[in-house]
Regions:
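A conserved alpha-helical element in kinase catalytic cores
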Residues: 78-111, 141, 201, 205
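ATP-binding glycine-rich loop module of kinase domains
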Residues: 30, 36-90
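Active-site beta-strand termini and strand-to-loop segments that position acidic
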Residues: 66-70, 118-119, 172-174
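Juxta-kinase regulatory segment immediately upstream of eukaryotic protein kinase catalytic domains
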Residues: 1-53, 238-246
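Hydrophobic residue at the +6 position relative to the catalytic HRD Asp in the kinase catalytic loop
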Residues: 166-172
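Conserved structural core of kinase catalytic domains
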Residues: 96, 103-144
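C-lobe/activation-segment region of protein kinase-like
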Residues: 162, 173-247
Length: 247
């Protein structure tokens, strides 16, 4: 892997500068993103083996690059130039709320179209579950921690909005689940984070994993009770029902 290139040096490379305004390669937008990186305090962007900016991910809202800030590797999210809004302030607000609830990678800064968060160097949840290499008790502990994080979001009134597809939104590092990407999150009186994750775990693609871990599908009535009253008692009942808690 090539060494990181300073943000100042990126400005001198038209090929790299163009990557900052994916997919249009708009010079003005690239400079806006570059200035935002400097204001936040990002020192450098990592290059890949081809000598281009290292792309960690690409969604309909952002591209994600690997950067360096205060000497640490970070994830740099830059709004796509074709997205309806080039302002990352709303996502930063939702991410900050999640952090205060003890959920998500640390938000390190944002400015204009750029948002910088703690880098989470782990596989997505589906890959982690499918790859194996863990004891069933360890995996159940990981899933219970994920459920607890969803419960905290529910109690805090923040709905992630995309957890029914945890492949893209939950990473696992050393057995610890990390919920990422709060771009679709919203404040609502009836969040559905826990029920979304339980729906994902009940999907057909994870039938083998459920059998290995001894997990069960929750009853609709129990899900309905939790939605109406996401109390600790209802949470514990659900966890016992699906097999993540004993008793």
């Amino acid at each position: 892997m090539s060494s990181p290139i300073s943000v100042h040096e990126v400005a001198k490379r038209a090929d790299l500068l163009g990557q900052l305004s994916y997919p249009h390669g708009d010079p003005r937008y690239s400079l806006e993103a570059l200035q935002a990186l400097e204001r936040i305090g990002v020192e450098a962007i990592t290059l890949d083996k081809r000598g281009l900016l290292k792309l960690l991910g690409k969604g309909f809202r952002n591209i994600v690059l690997e950067g360096v800030m205060a000497g640490e590797r970070v994830a740099v999210k830059i709004r796509r130039s074709d997205y309806v809004s080039r302002d990352a302030s709303r996502e930063a607000t939702m991410h900050g709320i999640a952090n205060r609830l003890g959920v998500g990678p640390r938000l390190l800064g944002w400015c204009g179209p750029v948002l910088v968060v703690e880098l989470v160097p782990g596989p997505d949840l589906s890959t982690w579950l499918a790859t194996g290499g863990y004891a069933p008790a360890e995996a159940r502990e990981t899933l219970l921690e994920l459920a607890l994080q969803c419960f905290r979001l529910d109690r805090g009134g923040l709905d992630h909005g995309e957890l029914s597809d945890a492949r893209r939104h939950v990473l696992v590092v050393g057995g610890r689940p990390v919920i990422i990407d709060f771009g679709s999150a919203r404040i609502t009186p009836r969040p559905k984070n826990l029920t979304s994750i339980l729906s994902y775990l009940s999907g057909g693609n994870l039938g083998g994993v459920r059998g290995l871990l001894g997990l069960r599908t929750p009853h609709r009535e129990a899900l309905r009770r939790y939605k109406e009253n996401p109390s600790e008692e209802q949470f514990v009942d659900l966890m016992r029902m699906v097999g993540l808690l004993e008793g």
